[in-house]
Structures are given as C-alpha cells and as structure tokens.
Amino acid sequence: MRRLSLWWLLSRVCLLLPPPCALVLAGVPSSSSHPQPCQILKRIGHAVRVGAVHLQPWTTAPRAASRAQEGGRAGAQRDDPESGTWRPPAPSQGARWLGSALHGRGPPGSRKLGEGAGAETLWPRDALLFAVENLNRVEGLLPYNLSLEVVMAIEAGLGDLPLMPFSSPSSPWSSDPFSFLQSVCHTVVVQGVSALLAFPQSQGEMMELDLVSSVLHIPVLSIVRHEFPRESQNPLHLQLSLENSLSSDADVTVSILTMNNWYNFSLLLCQEDWNITDFLLLTENNSKFHLESVINITANLSSTKDLLSFLQVQMDNIRNSTPTMVMFGCDMDSIRQIFEMSTQFGLSPPELHWVLGDSQNVEELRTEGLPLGLIAHGKTTQSVFEYYVQDAMELVARAVATATMIQPELALLPSTMNCMDVKTTNLTSGQYLSRFLANTTFRGLSGSIKVKGSTIISSENNFFIWNLQHDPMGKPMWTRLGSWQGGRIVMDSGIWPEQAQRHKTHFQHPNKLHLRVVTLIEHPFVFTREVDDEGLCPAGQLCLDPMTNDSSMLDRLFSSLHSSNDTVPIKFKKCCYGYCIDLLEQLAEDMNFDFDLYIVGDGKYGAWKNGHWTGLVGDLLSGTANMAVTSFSINTARSQVIDFTSPFFSTSLGILVRTRDTAAPIGAFMWPLHWTMWLGIFVALHITAIFLTLYEWKSPFGMTPKGRNRNKVFSFSSALNVCYALLFGRTAAIKPPKCWTGRFLMNLWAIFCMFCLSTYTANLAAVMVGEKIYEELSGIHDPKLHHPSQGFRFGTVRESSAEDYVRQSFPEMHEYMRRYNVPATPDGVQYLKNDPEKLDAFIMDKALLDYEVSIDADCKLLTVGKPFAIEGYGIGLPPNSPLTSNISELISQYKSHGFMDVLHDKWYKVVPCGKRSFAVTETLQMGIKHFSGLFVLLCIGFGLSILTTIGEHIVHRLLLPRIKNKSKLQYWLHTSQRFHRALNTSFVEEKQPRSKTKRVEKSRWRRWTCKTEGDSELSLFPRSNLGPQQLMVWNTSNLSHDNQRKYIFNDEEGQNQLGTQAHQDIPLPQRRRELPASLTTNGKADSLNVTRSSVIQELSELEKQIQVIRQELQLAVSRKTELEEYQKTNRTCES
C-alpha cells in the first residue's frame, strides 16, 4: 500500500509539472494497468458526455475574389420549425466523408473554411453528431470500451420548445448571462457532462461562457471564427480559432530563405492591400535580411502592355542587385503572365530565384508556363469546419482517457450536476480534467493540436515545400523537398536548389542505404515477365529468380549483376512489377535507399518446419534478406520472430469455388417466359379467336352466310388458325376476317405476338445454356468443411497464413485438407478450373481470390461464404530492425494522402467477369442437348396427330350418324365448315347431280354427217364444248361463244366448198356454276325439312332450265327444217 501511495503522490506532482513529466506516468503500475472501475462505469452508463451550447448556424463571409474557389458543403436537415422539435440530420456529403476523415482523405465537394464565392452556412449540430460518430469508431480512444455522447442545449432560436419560463422564442435565450447560466444548468449540466463545447459568435457570448466555466468549474472549449481578445486567463475556458494564422505562411517563407542563404531579396505584390506585415517583421528582426525593392504591379495587371513596360523598367533596376524574388497576393494566372514576361528579360532561374510567399493549393499546382527552380509551399488538404469540431471533441476524449488511468472517479464522475448545489471541494473533476487538456497534444484532422499558454488551442497545419524540377524523363514536375513541422523545416530526400547550384560542378551523391529485398510472386501484388534481349527491364524492376536461399550464392549473383562484366545467366533474370513493387519503389525514393530484389527460393511465405523457418521468414532470420515485400500476412507466429510494419493492405480469408453449367432440361425452351405468361398468352389467344368469330358473324360485311354473297365462311377454327399463325410467325395460308372490326382486332393481336416473341427470343440464349450451380458454403463453419462428405475436396496453400489459421483453429479440418494443399495460389485456382476438377473449394486470402475472379475469362470462379480471419499485409523486417518505425510512419502517410488508394485502383480496377459476359454469349454454341425438349415436343406432336386421325374416323363413323338423327344439332357452320358439311350431305344427294350431268353431256355432244356428190361431207359441230360442270345449276359462265355454226356446202358450179355462216342465237339466260344439290350459293346446306323459301327458289331454277332446253329444241327444229329443204333442193337439181 505504501508503494502505491508513493506512486499516487508522484502522479499528483507530475500534473503540476511541464508535459515531459507525463512520460514518467507511463511506467506507473497504477496508471498503466488500472483495474476496471465497474461501479463508476455503471453510474455513468459506460459513456463520457460532452455538452454543446450556442448551436446557432454560422454564416461565413466570402474572402477576396482572388482567393475564391468554387465548392459547396451539402446542407443537413434543418430543425422543423412547425413541430418545435429537433430531428436528426440527414447524412450529407461532408457527413458521409467524415467516416473516412480519420484516414486523412478530404471530403468530396466540401468547401474550405474562409473560401467560396459567397456566404456559406455552417451547422454546428451536424458537425457534432458526425464527430461523435467518427470518434466512437476509433478503437482505443477511450478506455474500458467507453463511448462518447453529446448533450445539446435546447435553444428556442433553432425551433426547439422552450423549457425554461425565462426563455421565449421572441427573444434570444442567452440575452441575459444569468438566464443563460440557468438554461445550461437545466438542459446540459444535469445530465453529467465532463466538458462543454461552444460555438460563440460575439464577445458577449464569450463572456457568458467565461461565467459558466468559472461558476460551474466545467471546462469549456469555444470554437470561434477568429480569436477573441480576453482579459482574464481562465484555464477552464479554451478557444480554438478556425482562422488560419498568416504568420504560418510568413514563418515558412522566412525559413525557406534562411535555409538557402537568400538574404537579399525583393518583393513583388499583385495586390496592394495584401497583408505581409508578419513577413516584414520577421525579416526586419533578422539583421541578415536585406530588402532591396518592392515591385507593386496591382495597377498594371489589367493591361498587358502597361505591365510589360513596367516590368521591364523594374527588372532592369534589380537585375544585378537582387538574386531572389518573393511573390505575394498573386494567383496562378498572374504568376504565369509574370514569368512569361520575365523570361523575355532573362530573369528566370538560376539568375533569379523565385519563391511564392503565399500558401498554395497543391492540387492546383501546374507546370505549364512556370520556370524550373520555383519554390512553393502549401498543404495537401485544406481544413473544413468539421475537422476543427472533431479535433476539439477528440481533445476532450484524449484528456479524459489519460485522466481516467490516474484517478477514474475524479475523471469520470462530474463534480457538478446540480447548479443549486455546487461543491466547493479543493479539486473538482473539471479542474482536474483541465490540467490534462493543457498537456494533451496529438495530430488531428485540422493540424497539430496543442494548447499554447493556458487558454489558446492551436491547430498548426503541416506545410509541404515543393520545387519545380525535371523528372527522370526530362519533363517538369513538382518535387517535394521537405515539410514544415513544429516551427522548422524537415528535409526530405533530395537536394535544394541552392545546394544544387553550389555543388553542380563537384556534386557527389550521398551514401545510400543498400538493402536486399525478397519477394514472392502473388498476383496482383507481384508479377514477373521475361527480360528483353539485352537482359534489361523496359518496365518494372530487375529481379533475380535463383531458386535458392543460399546467401553466398545470392552475393555472387548480385555482385556479378552490378559489375561491368555481367555474367548472370539470363534464365535467372526477371522483371518484377505489381502493387508491392510500386510501394517498394516509393519507399526507396522517400527513404533514400537502393535495393536488390530477388524471388524467394522455395516459393513459401514461411512456417516452422523441421526445426527451422522456411520461405520469407527464414530468409529474414538468416540475414539473406533485409526486407520482405509481398502479400505477407501478419500473424502471431511470424510476429514473434520477425518485425512487421503497420499493415498496408487489409484483407481476410475467403473460399473460392467453381461454377458449373448444368445441362438444359427438357422444358428449357419454355423458361424464357414464366408459366403464368405462357398461360396468359394461350388464354388471350382463345379469347381473341372467340371475339374474331363473333365480330365476323355479327358484321354485315363478314365472311358468313348472311354476308355479301361470300363463297367461303369464317368459322371459329379459321379464327384459331389465324391466331396461331400470327403467334408463331408461320407463313401458312390463312382465311383472314373480312369485317373491319375483325381486321383491327387481328392487327392488335399481331402486335401483341410481336412483343411476346421478341422477349422470348432475347432470353432464349441465356436460358438454353442451363443454370450455373456451385458449392454453396456459408463460411469456415459450414458443415461441408467440418464433416466433408465422400469426394468433397478442399485445400489451401502450404505454409501460408491460411493453413496456419486452420491448423490452430480447426485441427481436424486441417488434418483432412492436408492431402489437398497446393504449393501456390495459381495451382489451387488451376485445380478448380480443371476438367474434371481436382478441388471443390480453395481457401486463401480474399484479396488474392477476388483478383483471380476478376481476371477469369471463363467466368467460372466465385467467392462464397462470409469472410473470416481478418488480417493485414505488412512488410517483413528482421527482428529489432531500425527501419520498422520509419516505414510504418511512411505507410501511414501513404494511407492518409491517398497513395494506397491509387495503387489499389491501378492494380485492382479490372473489368468484372459479369461485365464481360457478352464475350461468352457471342461464341455460344448450342448442341442437341439444349434443344432436346423441342425434339420431344415434335415427337409428342406426331403421336397426337395419329390420335387425331383415329379420332376423326371415330367421329365420322360413330358420332356423325347420331348427331344427324337430332334435328337441333345440325348447324355447325360457325364452328367448323367441314363438320357442318359432313352433317348435311349424304351419298344419294351427291350421286344424282353426277348422273344428270353425264346425260346432259351426251345430249350436248352430237355430231351430224351428210355426204354429198364429190364425196363431200357436211359436219355439224356443237356450238360449244361444255365441261361437266357447265350444265350445273350454279354455273355462272356465259354462252356468248355458242353463236357460230359451221356449214359444208357446194356452190352453183357443183364444187364442194366450205363456208361459215354466222348465226345469232337467241340469248340464253345467265347460268351459275352448279354446286352439290345440298348447297346454296354461299355454301349453306339445305335441311331435310325444306322450307317454303327454298322450294320456291328451286322451282325458279327449274323453270330457267326448262326455258333453256326449249330454246335449244326450237333451234334444233329450225335447223332440221333448213336441212330438209336443202336436201330437197339437191335432189331436184339431180333430177
């Protein structure tokens, strides 16, 4: 107990001493391993609460036009003025970005503070909520798994319901300091807050906050637009100013001049009212600096001619006296214009050193029109309002965390929760916490956070210094020379312009650290390709693949490689490139070291085997390699023997399977459309056929017996024939409807069929290939892995982190899968893709599996299940390597600056397999297995046709006789014309007109022959050749050609002559083509009980036939008389 009391006393004393004493507390047992104060955590609800007051929105004023930039911050959801209640804000662009703000990436579209073409509204409530959300995701920020909560004051000015009788919406709730104090007590303090965050906008509000902190003994952090002067130095009231101090630019510029010994300088001002007071004070206080002249071109910028003449005069005056020119208040367009004119007078570097005194936006720096050697400074990211709010909240959290490890009760339990009963103890919780606030420093989003004096929180941004130089290809590029940190310049690798100028004749490269780096081929982190004919690498890094880890052998190979007489066999040389090679090159550039690269001899990551470490770990431990750069997983076993940097890539383990195309089933041709669609199509088809039939039979112009003397009838079977022909697009002869309504409906049905058929055709190819199936695994805990059935094979890479994880977590599973493990990742992928496959599942790092899936041209690979065993890739180093911390710090910078994101996009932005599916469908060939269902359907159709034929015979022999006996079922013309004829026609009725036709033919085909003297012969031909159908009742042919007669007679000289005499017959009535006796002109059949109308019609037809026969008889008798007279005349002549 006495020992603990001494340590407690030492900790209390250190609180009163400067910050270095805080380091002593790191070794205090009671501070480093304090037991969890369960009762205290229960009382505070496992949360640290921070109050918030003065939450009225801010409206920022625009800056000068020359510094204005476009941008905008998405507004959050406002409070509802009608309901009087506050609602949580909707996520905005800044909100969504703040989730990644801890990694240093700027929010897309966020406007920088103090910039913008116009006024901008800032919402403290939104910033507080998002700050709490982000900080609660940071692991280890608060001890004992505590979380941050924000308690916001109720303010009538924002539409909240006033809770106090002294506050009203018509007047500001903080107009009276005492009322403000009471309001804070009743709405914020009573909930037990450790500190208050405020957003005052006036000096009066600052005084109110001074009063609150003094009376309630609660730390108050005020975030202000600009620093307010204060008479009292209240350590409980701190203020953080958002306004960037101009002295920072002045300090950086002066340090640049001092480092290069550029003490004689001149100033060039593009804006006369630009504030350079701080810069002038710093140079005047240093006796080494001498200001030659000040060139003010503000009045001449508008006219190029005036600017040219003015610069010519001024440059002539300083040509020989001033080696350095510092520019202030110039935008990039003005700078380019000035440099173009200066070049005409020969004043470009190195004759004149140009320095930009104002902080520049690094993203806007360009190289066009700027001279080599130009020096600029600026920040890679600009601070936004949310940065400062989150940094203030993080300052409180860090102070509470540090204080909790010393005295948890005093740090976590607020002393003031009732304003009416303020405790007057010697040390309140607020006073205790304020001491830690003053001694807390950290690197925040807005800059380096620390407390200056006792009341000012400073946020110093790190400036980077850039120089325009030539890249290795000879092109101009901005090169980083160093950074401004903690009030001084920290140089990076490289050489400053003045140093290069002094040593350009006898410059010697400094000695660089030379490292031997081992790697392992793993796509996309490391690729290899063959070298060219000369043994060099046009792209990538030259590496050796000696297939050994013998250190002496590697020494000889690299020694020969660097000698003038290179004798390394060409088979050992490779060109290495990829994600990790780019990272290695960047590290070498930033840390100023050279390296030799080789591929690990055994191709293993490293595992403890046969009493020693293999692979990459073995090379690091044996001293063969100084660094291992590849997809090197950080696990417990490796971390115990070698050093790892902070992870540069986060991943997990995953499971890779192969998809298989199943054979298309018999009914696959039906799959393009759902069964409900097929049902709907055929229902709509028959409904359409019914309506087509109804429209045709109800129309006066339809193809029906009541129509306009139609020779055909449109029945329901005709409608079905039309609908099916349009649906399947067959070009068979159809009987289209004649009425307008029917044709319109038929065209609508054609449009419907066109869209259905197009949809079916578009989906047919994708469906015909069959469904893709794969092994469905839920993850590492899937029963198929723990209890594999016979024939299920899965494995991983030997001596990898995946195998180590399975060995430690699931020994039985590891024992089963050992027989299926493969040497490398490509082997496992190939085993999956083989036909037949040698593996059913492959377990490996998901980062590697995702890449294999993305480059799979056959689209057969797929990752399944939930990821497991979260891990990271790090750079391996020998134990206790001095490079570990430096490389880890650079990797953290690469993450915050977005360099790692660039690498990820470069090597992982591959076209996904899903978007390349068109390349597969273009060459898709379908075999008979894909159309087996259609052949089956055709065979079924043949069988149904045979059954239909049998059915026709059954109907004809059995059903028709029965229906004929029923007089009510004789009319079927609207349904089927053939069925109707079959019911209404008999054999006897068809036989009578046939016999009659034959008798008429015989009577019409007659021939008379008369022989005269001289063996003459008179032949009488019939007037026409009438076919067998021309004497039928319904014959419609005319007999106009039956009016010519041929005669053979002798002239008066007794010579036989042939003559033709035209004889006009008596016109015959028009006759129609005869149809079967049981049919009328429009195809209607007579019933057995003939109606009166049909009898009259038949009598009229018979009368016409009799008239025709009578006329023919008269003609025959007349002709007979003529012939008889002619015969008598001849006889008289002979006598």
UniProtKB/Swiss-Prot annotation:
Q: Which residues lie on this side of the membrane: Cytoplasmic?
A: 695-715, 728-741, 949-1135
Tell me the disulfide pairings in this chain.
C537-C575, C543-C576, C859-C913
Instruction: Summarize what activates or inhibits it.
Output: Excitatory glycine receptors are inhibited by D-serine at a concentrion of 10uM.
- Enumerate the residue ranges of region (Disordered): 60-117
Q: Which reaction does it catalyse?
A: Ca(2+)(in) = Ca(2+)(out); Na(+)(in) = Na(+)(out)
Arranged from A to Z, the UniProt key words for this protein are:
Calcium, Cell membrane, Coiled coil, Disulfide bond, Glycoprotein, Ion channel, Ion transport, Ligand-gated ion channel, Magnesium, Membrane, Postsynaptic cell membrane, Receptor, Signal, Synapse, Transmembrane, Transmembrane helix, Transport
Q: Which residues cross the membrane?
A: 675-694, 742-761, 933-948
Q: How is it modified after translation?
A: N-glycosylated.
Point out the signal peptide segment: 1-23
Please list the coiled coil stretches: 1080-1129
Region annotated GIT1-binding sits at 1082-1115
Which tissues express it?
Answer: Isoform 1 and isoform 2 are expressed in olfactory bulb, frontal occipital, entorhinal and pyriform cortices, hippocampus, striatum, thalamus, cerebellum and spinal cord.
Which positions does UniProt annotate for glycine binding?
S631, S633, R638, S801, D845
Subcellular location as annotated: Cell membrane; Postsynaptic cell membrane; Postsynaptic density
Query: What function does this protein fulfil?
Result: Component of a non-conventional N-methyl-D-aspartate (NMDA) receptors (NMDARs) that function as heterotetrameric, ligand-gated cation channels with low calcium permeability and low voltage-dependent block by Mg(2+). During the development of neural circuits, participates in the synaptic refinement period, restricting spine maturation and growth. Forms glutamatergic receptor complexes with GluN1 and GluN2 subunits which are activated by glycine binding to the GluN1 and GluN3 subunits and L-glutamate binding to GluN2 subunits.
User: Its quaternary structure?
Assistant: Heterotetramer. Forms heterotetrameric channels composed of two GluN1/zeta subunits (GRIN1), and two identical GluN3 subunits (GRIN3A or GRIN3B) (in vitro). Can also form heterotetrameric channels that contain at least two GluN1 subunits and at least a combination of one GluN2 and one GluN3 subunits (in vitro). Does not form functional homomeric channels. Found in a complex with GRIN1, GRIN2A or GRIN2B and PPP2CB. Probably interacts with PPP2CB. No complex with PPP2CB is detected when NMDARs are stimulated by NMDA.
| UniProt family annotation | Belongs to the glutamate-gated ion channel (TC 1.A.10.1) family. NR3A/GRIN3A subfamily.
Q: What is the designated name of this protein?
A: Glutamate receptor ionotropic, NMDA 3A
What is the species of this protein? Rattus norvegicus
Phylogenetic classification of the source organism? Eukaryota, Metazoa, Chordata, Craniata, Vertebrata
| Gene name for this UniProt entry | Grin3a
